[in-house]
Curated annotation (Swiss-Prot):
SMART domains: SecA_DEAD, SecA_PP_bind. GO terms for cellular component: cell envelope Sec protein transport complex; cytosol; plasma membrane. One of its GO terms (biological process) is protein transport by the Sec complex. Its cofactor is Zn(2+). The lineage of its organism: Bacteria, Pseudomonadati, Pseudomonadota, Alphaproteobacteria, Rickettsiales. This is Protein translocase subunit SecA. It comes from Ehrlichia ruminantium (strain Gardel). Monomer and homodimer. Part of the essential Sec protein translocation apparatus which comprises SecA, SecYEG and auxiliary proteins SecDF-YajC and YidC. It catalyses: ATP + H2O + cellular proteinSide 1 = ADP + phosphate + cellular proteinSide 2. ATP binds at Q86, G104, E105, G106, K107, T108, D499.
Length: 870
């Protein structure tokens, strides 16, 4: 019934696109009006649009002429005219939806339409890319277009300093990466004054490769961390014991990436621990005193049995560098949490660094939901449309291609073993190479790409390898990948950001070929020769069948496979794609059902022979869909827990901003509440009457907080609670009045400035400790389900109680720190104390060279950041 209805009325996507063509026709109808304008008149249109907005018009009201202006400016500046389908993509972005556009359809140019229109409000537009290279490329490239229209453009890279970051954020449009934006938000909420903050709000974001950022990286939070004291030698001691375990000692769940000791394993590891004097002979592994040992063992097992070198991480300059499982890129600066990184360092016999404590964190899910309007672009989002709509309220709109796709997608070939599969791949590549067809081979890991590279070398087939080891040459390798006879092996990273053009990427080739030539006349001659060569090579590649894309195994997500296929057949070019699989591939081995193996037996699978059948293809798709649903459920569950933390983050950051915005504080209101709480808590919680023991406890608490000694004889004569509170208030009033007078005599605003800093530092310290407590709570909360309790509700309840306790401690800590301030040599002693305290909050007493990068993540050297005053 649904298919019949779609044939009659068209799908929702078709109807929406059809309706948008009405707006496109309006833009086309007025195109000639802007063609006759001078460059200056075209630029002045920006001023006109801003005036119209100030006079009450909306962005939708000026969309048609604004898009026409951008199209005309693009023709003049970039020599590129927006196609009608690109205009549709721009409208979709402006409306806060996702434009799904095939590779090569010009997403970078499409973004200029929505970015320009929304920049007219003057509230800022963030164009988000996946790496610094693309951010800089797009800012430089599209910046010429924006500047010609009087729109300012900024670019923020990983090494951009705070001053330049602030300037960039104040531009109309800023290009940056998701990581830079997220970390800037966290760092801003660790700053000690508004003037130090760099961001100016969250108005509108256009996220390129939106599926990668909002889906694939949704489970990885951004974390600013500092090191904590711990027994790092224990990681090496435990690592040595892991080699003593056999397969019967642990149970591995590859689907969920979990590992557990069996009863046999527990007995063996306990004996080994006792033998090496790591636990007492009369204790058990699960005794309270030994629970931390269990933590070390679990992480060591995960490091050895679940995480693999050249797949999950590589070793570079003596450090473990995590590999992004979705892009294949190195994630410099990222570390596994909860001791896993240290366990891997011990496994690889590297120097084990201290574990980190979270100072601030946020997930991309919650970061991007702060924007008033959010939109995105990608070549593959339809398979994740349910999640994008459910979590981010983003509708996916499939934009038609400008010219029909001519790529041929061949059926998968399935072999018994990986060895047979690789033999078939080499044979297929060799056949393509003979007819000069360019080939791109996609692998899921560095390990597999290097196995294939060795086989190609053995067969004397010249090729290039693009993976995290050689990421510096990425742009150049991609530029060459469409040249006839070229063979390129790539991990997932190759599918992002850069087009593979048949014949080669002229702009990139010109940049590398002509870089060292100074004579303009020679450059002109060489460039013409290069253009002729690229055009000739393009024809050869087309005649050979276009780019051939080979997948060496299926990814867990259909979307990643579609991205690989999408490298071929750009803008109507011919192309070919084919996947080679084996029963030893992770997807089929872990997630494939016995049904698939049964099918293959029925089809008479023999060694060295490939099977092609629609049954198998459908079964594999079902396995992928099953994994996608599982991953979606995991992300949904994580989001529910993170939403609890996110709401608390908003409360704390809002409180922090209110402190920063306030210039004077009525401290007496705080300490009077605290005095009342001290007396009430001691009397109500522990004692019913005002007796000697009660007076001693109250006196002790007052001394602890204020360093004031109460006169025992005086307070013991007070017969009521109210009189006692009044007496303590009078004493603390007098104490603080003297202290304030003492400080203000040195400098008028000194007390208020110190109070503000103490309040900020106290809140930051307690928030850091609170995050650690929430992490611990979250780790064990699922065990509550054994007692028939909902873990999420339990987490919400306890997290709220913990926040209440934190805020109560916050006020007490403020008073305690202020009470202990000394005015003697305040500009020297306390200024140094304050700076040391601030530094310890941000980096948690890390011992670091002054010329190394600051651990806070600012990108600056330590001596120019948190080590400036040390």
């Amino acid at each position: 019934m649904l298919n019949i209805a779609q044939r009659i009325f068209g799908s929702t996507n078709t109807r929406l696109v059809k309706s948008l063509y009405k707006i496109v026709n309006q833009i086309n109808a007025i195109e000639h009006e802007f063609q006759i304008l001078s460059d200056e008149s075209l630029k002045n249109k920006t001023i006109e649009f801003k005036e119209q907005l100030n006079n009450g018009k909306t962005l939708d009201d000026i969309l048609v002429p604004a898009f026409a202006v951008v199209r005309e400016a693009s023709k003049r500046i970039l020599n590129m005219r927006h196609f009608d389908v690109q205009l549709i993509g721009g409208i979709v972005l402006h409306k806060g939806m996702i434009s799904e556009m095939k590779t090569g359809e010009g997403k970078t140019l499409v973004a200029t339409l929505a970015a320009y229109l929304n920049a007219l409000e003057g509230k800022g537009v963030h164009v988000v890319t996946v790496n610094d290279y693309l951010a800089k490329r797009d800012a430089d490239w599209m910046g010429e277009l924006y500047n010609s229209l009087g729109i300012t453009v900024g670019c923020i890279l990983s090494d951009t300093n705070d001053l330049d970051r602030k300037k960039a954020y104040n531009c109309d449009i800023v290009y940056s990466t998701n990581n830079n934006l997220g970390f800037d938000y966290l760092r801003d909420n660790m700053k000690f004054s508004r003037n130090e903050m760099v961001q100016r709000g969250f108005n509108y974001a256009i996220v390129d490769e939106v599926d990668l950022i909002l889906i694939d990286e949704a489970r990885t939070p951004l974390i600013i961390s500092g090191q904590v004291d711990q027994d790092i030698k224990m990681y090496n001691k435990i690592d040595k014991l892991i080699y003593e375990l056999s397969e019967e000692d642990y149970e591995l769940e590859e689907k969920h990436r979990n590992i557990f000791l069996t009863e046999c394993g527990i007995t063996k590891i306990e004996n080994l621990l006792i033998q090496h004097k790591l636990i007492s002979s009369n204790t058990s592994l699960y005794d309270i005193d030994n629970m931390i040992i269990m933590h070390y063992i679990t992480q060591a097992l995960r490091a050895h049995k679940i995480f693999s070198l050249d797949k999950d991480y590589i070793i570079k300059d003596g450090n473990i560098i995590i590999i992004d499982e979705f892009t294949g890129r190195m994630m410099d600066g990222r570390r596994y949490s909860d001791g896993l990184h240290q366990a891997i360092e011990a496994k690889e016999k590297l120097n084990v660094n201290n574990e980190n404590q979270t100072l601030a964190s946020i997930t991309f899910q919650n970061y991007f939901r702060m924007y008033k309007k959010l939109s995105g672009m990608t070549g593959t989002a339809e398979t994740e449309s349910e999640e994008l709509l459910g979590i981010y309220n983003l509708q996916v709109v499939q934009i038609p291609t400008n010219t029909p796709v001519q790529r041929i997608d061949l059926n998968d070939d399935i072999y018994c073993t990986e060895e047979e599969k690789f033999d078939a791949i080499i044979k297929f590549i060799s056949e393509c190479h003979k007819k000069l067809q360019p080939v791109l081979v996609g692998t899921i890991s560095i390990e597999k790409s290097e196995i294939l590279s060795k086989l190609l070398t053995k067969n004397k087939l010249k090729h290039s390898v693009l993976n995290a080891r050689y990421h510096e040459q990425e742009a150049y390798i991609i530029a060459q990948a469409g040249i006839p006879g070229t063979i390129t092996i790539a991990t997932n990273m190759a599918g992002r950001g850069t087009d593979i053009q048949l014949g080669g990427n002229l702009k990139m080739l010109a940049k590398t070929t002509l870089a060292n030539i100074l004579d303009k006349e020679i450059i002109s001659i060489k460039y013409k020769q290069l253009v002729e060569k690229v055009n000739k090579d393009k024809e050869i590649a087309i005649q050979a069948g276009g780019l051939c894309v080979i997948g060496t195994e299926r990814h867990e997500s259909r979307r990643i496979d579609n991205q690989l296929r999408g490298r071929s057949g750009r803008q109507g070019d011919p192309g070919l794609s084919k996947f080679f699989l084996s029963l030893e591939d992770d997807l089929l081995r872990i997630f494939g059902s016995d049904k698939i193996k049964g099918m293959l037996k029925k089809l008479g699978m023999k060694k060295g022979e490939a099977i092609q059948h629609t049954w198998i293809s459908r079964a594999i798709e079902k396995a992928q869909h099953k994994v996608e649903l599982r991953n979606y459920d995991i992300r949904k569950s994580l989001l529910k827990f993170d939403n609890v933390i996110n709401e608390q983050r908003k409360v704390v950051f809002d409180q922090r901003n209110r402190i920063l915005d306030n210039d004077s504080y009525n401290i007496s209101l705080i300490y009077r509440d605290i005095n009342s709480d001290i007396v009430n808590n001691i009397i109500h919680d522990k004692y019913y009457n005002l007796d000697d023991e009660t007076y001693k406890l109250i006196s002790s608490e007052i001394t602890r907080i204020y360093s004031i000694t109460l006169d025992y004889n005086t307070i013991s004569e007070l017969e009521s609670k109210n009189k006692l509170i009044e007496h303590i208030n009078n004493i603390t009033d007098e104490f603080f009045n003297k202290k304030i007078a003492e400080f203000t005599s040195k400098e008028k605003d000194l007390w208020d400035n110190l109070t503000k800093k103490v309040m900020i530092m106290s809140l930051d310290y307690l928030w850091r400790e609170h995050l650690a407590a929430l992490d611990s709570l979250k780790c064990g909360i699922n065990l509550r389900s054994i007692a028939q309790k909902d873990p999420l509700n339990e987490f919400k309840s306890e997290a709220f109680s913990m926040l209440e306790s934190m805020m109560s401690n916050f006020y007490e800590l403020i008073i305690q720190r202020l009470a202990h301030l000394k005015s003697d040599n305040i500009f020297h002693s306390y200024s140094k104390e304050l700076n040391n305290l601030q530094s310890s909050q941000d980096i948690n007493s890390i011992k670091i060279s002054r010329n190394e990068k600051c651990p806070c993540g600012s990108g600056k050297k330590y001596k120019h950041c948190h080590g400036e005053n040390i």
